[in-house]
Amino acid sequence: MKSAVVQLPGLNRDCDMIAALTKISGKAPVTVWQTETEIPDVDLIVIPGGFSYGDYLRCGAIAARMPVMQAIKAKAEQGVRVLGVCNGFQILVEAGLLPGALMRNASLKFVCREVKLEVVNADTAFTRAYAKGQVIRSPVAHHDGNYFADAETLKAIEGNGQVVFRYAEGTNPNGSVNDIAGVLNAKGNVLGMMPHPENLIESAHGGADGRGLFASALDVIAA
């Protein structure tokens, strides 16, 4: 499968994401700049982490209004898989591709550490390599990862299986409601998550717990 990594001013995890996608699929992803109005024929689009536009206004608010986002929305409507990690998650929420909002961490501090994630839904295009209830490790590094949604939205996403990852008990780093760490859109082809799976894909680098997400999304589960 072919993949693309979106590049915007201030994003600084694009190289990590490119390395992860290349390692898992054996093919280097194409890169797409913020001003592009068309995206090549790919199967997976990734918006990596960082601090797009310095996080001014709100995290992801300016990036969500760049020309490339209209192209991403069009691809998502066609069923192309879209993954947003950390700032990428914030951008997808600001663009209206995912429900909820991401607020300042409850501690009011930047958090950079490893957490444990529970795989809540293993029957998705992004989690088929995992088992439901499996607990995996993943790094986090963010200041505004506190996921919030109103009661009606929470009921809907919990009931529809759109909550994909939850911080394991006692490891919630930011105060996210219901310990939510990653959510899908209703269609199931757009995933946003605050943790960084791209930083744990090789045992030599501390672990490979994140590998399953990319293997699932790229249809290379046996990789």
Curated annotation (Swiss-Prot):
Reactions accelerated catalytically: N(2)-formyl-N(1)-(5-phospho-beta-D-ribosyl)glycinamide + L-glutamine + ATP + H2O = 2-formamido-N(1)-(5-O-phospho-beta-D-ribosyl)acetamidine + L-glutamate + ADP + phosphate + H(+); L-glutamine + H2O = L-glutamate + NH4(+)
E.C. no: 6.3.5.3, 3.5.1.2
Ranges for domain Glutamine amidotransferase type-1: 3-223
Subcellular location: Cytoplasm
Pathway where this protein functions: Purine metabolism; IMP biosynthesis via de novo pathway; 5-amino-1-(5-phospho-D-ribosyl)imidazole from N(2)-formyl-N(1)-(5-phospho-D-ribosyl)glycinamide: step 1/2
Keywords, in A-Z order: ATP-binding, Cytoplasm, Glutamine amidotransferase, Hydrolase, Ligase, Nucleotide-binding, Purine biosynthesis
Keyword Lipoprotein: no
InterPro entries attached to this UniProt entry: Class_I_gatase-like (IPR029062), PRibForGlyAmidine_synth_PurQ (IPR010075)
Pfam family for this entry, one: GATase_5
Record-level GO BP terms: 'de novo' IMP biosynthetic process
An MF annotation (GO) of this entry: ATP binding
Keyword Flavoprotein listed: no
GO cellular component terms listed in the entry, alphabetical order: cytoplasm
Signal sequence annotation: none
Active site residues of this protein: 86 (nucleophile), 196, 198
Main location class: cytoplasm
Subunit structure: Part of the FGAM synthase complex composed of 1 PurL, 1 PurQ and 2 PurS subunits.
Function: Part of the phosphoribosylformylglycinamidine synthase complex involved in the purines biosynthetic pathway. Catalyzes the ATP-dependent conversion of formylglycinamide ribonucleotide (FGAR) and glutamine to yield formylglycinamidine ribonucleotide (FGAM) and glutamate. The FGAM synthase complex is composed of three subunits. PurQ produces an ammonia molecule by converting glutamine to glutamate. PurL transfers the ammonia molecule to FGAR to form FGAM in an ATP-dependent manner.
Name under which the protein is recorded: Phosphoribosylformylglycinamidine synthase subunit PurQ
The species this protein was found in: Rhizobium meliloti (strain 1021)
